[in-house]
């Protein structure tokens, strides 16, 4: 039996939980697992870190009531408590995680100069570095999801017009755009670094490749982003989701219409996009208090 199956069997047979309650736990575990599979890869329950959980709760919490998010965290806490007591995992990553009641945590993001600092640090000309520079630039310029960038094919790129046809969630297509600087980094990767990485491997048409010349995985991209930001001295726990947040926040801070940002992000519900207006207001409040002349 899988770890999930052992846990669900324990709830049903030893704790005598109702079928409805057991099903709720099953759905909560499946939702978390699916999120990680689509956003960095799922290495196994014994490899999930506190940071993985925080990213999941942050992303999920933008579109759920606080009570629903609390239930999801409670399910994961119960699951890991079971696993640790049975010796099925060594550590419980949920131990130190608490939700602030009644208030959703605002998305974490990077300022434009911070992203610029990271991009400028990727300058040694090595194929993987050129690839990583293109990845960071595209994440920030387009706001694409990790799964969307991972699955990106060359045929989806329109370099001349600075556009990408993105195959989003629920088989919904949309166009995103990128600037001249990102175009330069992408072209440098496609023209020199990608052929160097590809070597004698069959060309699948995937835009981003790993060091073996094969399509890079979501987890490979997530790991690369984390290492890039850590090496640049910004944070030890950066995730592609935060570059997506950074794109949305930058657009709104510079006067973009909320519905336009919704379209670019591929959000089905406007309320999911509205969380970024709170981030923008928080930023503006800080700027006002720092720079308004009357103290």
From Swiss-Prot:
Pfam family, one: Phage_integrase
Protein keywords: Cell cycle, Cell division, Chromosome partition, Cytoplasm, DNA integration, DNA recombination, DNA-binding
Claim: Plastid is one of the keywords in the record: no
Entry GO terms, CC: cytoplasm
GO biological process: cell division; chromosome segregation; DNA transposition
Tyr recombinase domain mapped to chain residues: 105-289
Residues at the active site: 145, 169, 241, 244, 267, 276
Domain Core-binding (CB): 1-84
Quaternary structure annotation from Swiss-Prot or TrEMBL: Forms a cyclic heterotetrameric complex composed of two molecules of XerC and two molecules of XerD.
Family listed: Belongs to the 'phage' integrase family. XerC subfamily.
Task of the protein: Site-specific tyrosine recombinase, which acts by catalyzing the cutting and rejoining of the recombining DNA molecules. The XerC-XerD complex is essential to convert dimers of the bacterial chromosome into monomers to permit their segregation at cell division. It also contributes to the segregational stability of plasmids.
PANTHER family associated with the record: PHAGE INTEGRASE-RELATED, TYROSINE RECOMBINASE XERC
Name of this protein: Tyrosine recombinase XerC
């Amino acid at each position: 039996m899988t770890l999930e199956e052992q846990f669900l069997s324990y709830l049903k047979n030893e704790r005598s939980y109702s079928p409805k309650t057991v099903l709720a736990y099953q759905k909560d575990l499946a939702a978390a697992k699916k999120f990680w599979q689509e956003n960095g890869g799922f290495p196994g329950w014994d490899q999930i870190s506190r940071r993985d959980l925080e990213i999941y709760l942050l992303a999920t919490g933008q579109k759920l009531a606080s009570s629903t998010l609390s239930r999801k965290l409670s399910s994961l806490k119960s699951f890991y408590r079971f696993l640790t007591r049975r010796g099925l995992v060594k550590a419980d990553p949920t131990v130190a995680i608490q939700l602030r009641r009644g208030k959703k945590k605002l998305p974490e993001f990077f300022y434009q100069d911070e992203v610029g600092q990271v991009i400028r640090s990727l300058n040694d000309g090595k194929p993987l570095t050129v690839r990583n520079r293109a990845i960071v630039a595209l994440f920030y310029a387009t706001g694409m999801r990790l799964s969307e960038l991972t699955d990106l094919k060359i045929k989806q790129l329109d370099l001349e017009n600075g556009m990408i046809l993105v195959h989003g969630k629920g088989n919904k297509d949309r166009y995103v755009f990128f600037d001249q600087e990102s175009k330069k980094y992408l072209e440098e990767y496609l023209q020199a670094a990608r052929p160097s990485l590809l070597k004698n491997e069959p060309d699948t048409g995937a835009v981003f490749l790993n060091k073996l010349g094969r399509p890079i995985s979501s987890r490979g991209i997530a790991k690369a982003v984390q290492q890039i930001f850590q090496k640049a001295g910004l944070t030890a726990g950066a995730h592609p989701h935060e570059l997506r947040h950074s794109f949305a926040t930058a657009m709104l801070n510079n006067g973009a219409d909320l519905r336009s940002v919704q379209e670019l992000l591929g959000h089905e519900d406007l309320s999911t996009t509205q969380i970024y207006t709170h981030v923008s207001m928080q930023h503006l409040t800080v700027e006002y208090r720092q720079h308004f002349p009357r103290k």
